[in-house]
């Protein structure tokens, strides 16, 4: 019979998921341009690192993808969506380490657990 | 030696976490009053249920807590924060069922895995 | 010499702008599908109508545009952006009526004051 | 008979309002602490300055108010709300300059047009 209480590994993965959902839905829609990409990435990292059990957040806002998007239209900024960012999040929960990331996969920003270590 | 790949139970918990972070950071800050609480709760449920592996979302926006908050000031609406809502989320990932919830605990909106079942 | 204090008409237009920025940046990024479009539109209207001097908000989430977007990919939901919604906002500030709207124009969700009446 | 079309001054005020609503509802709810306040303020300024006709945005996240809030509880971060920030926005629309600001007034974050100049 499997236990219905979460293990520490499972709770650590739950915590990793919270950070991804928070980061994405807090900042999606933010006006962004090649010139403001760095300050946004820095703020996203520092904001989510405030959350419990969050060891490190690495956000890469791809200025080249922003430039490509803007080359086709009259505007000089767009809205942040998953297609412009890679994210890596590192959780430390009770000695369990979780690395999860977000990457564009077949046109969608997929969030996955990369590894769980004790 | 423990495996570093996530189990299905761990991935199911990760998915539950994503939904909580998404729900909270998408809707926190929304102008809300006793009269608009129901429509907001309904929209929050339907929005997050769109996400993958999300079986059901139950959002309770407490009109009594809104009324109490508003009784002390001149405004007739406030901004949505965790102190006004209870949330239950039910995940079904590859036959693993996760129930997680958000409840106010000592003044903070804590998100926890309630149970994991196969 | 022009006065530097805002007139009531100008303040009414400022209030209209606040409502548009609020609506757009609160709800952009929300997971949405043809099935959840109605509940989201209703919640957006009720939420923003809470704000001061806001007489009426009319949000039309275009289910046909959502269906067209989703026809091309593997997912059955997307994120709310301006290309899926028309918005009309009606302000009443000190007897000044402002009607403003958001419409897709050459690929961009433009927000404009339609009319100001006393 | 007053004209129902907006004047340039009125449109400039509408644009100022859009920026305030955008800034507030994009960033309200962001996890923030004294240590992350500066990076968040910088990102808010750069993000909103991307928007059309937006000359300058000045955001002051009050670290002292954050420290005071956090002194009473067990957490070392909170969520961004109006009570922690002052905002000044400067619009230049067709030669019309609008300065608007957000300040806490009797417990509420009020947004006002400070001056309109040609």
Identify the role of each PLM range.
Chain A
Residues 1-118:
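Short beta-strand/helix segments in adaptor/scaffold domains that form protein-protein interfaces
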């Amino acid at each position: 019979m499997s236990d219905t209480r979460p293990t520490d590994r499972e709770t650590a993965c739950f915590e990793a998921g919270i950070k991804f959902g928070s980061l994405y839905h807090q900042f999606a829609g933010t006006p962004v341009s090649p010139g403001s990409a760095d300050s946004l990435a820095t703020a996203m990292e520092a904001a989510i690192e405030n959350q419990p059990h969050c060891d490190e957040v690495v956000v890469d806002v791809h200025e080249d993808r922003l430039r490509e998007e803007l080359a086709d239209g009259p505007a000089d900024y767009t809205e942040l969506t998953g297609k412009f960012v890679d994210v890596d999040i590192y959780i430390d929960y009770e000695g369990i380490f979780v690395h999860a990331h977000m990457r564009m996969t077949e046109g969608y920003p997929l969030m996955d657990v990369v590894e769980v270590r004790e």
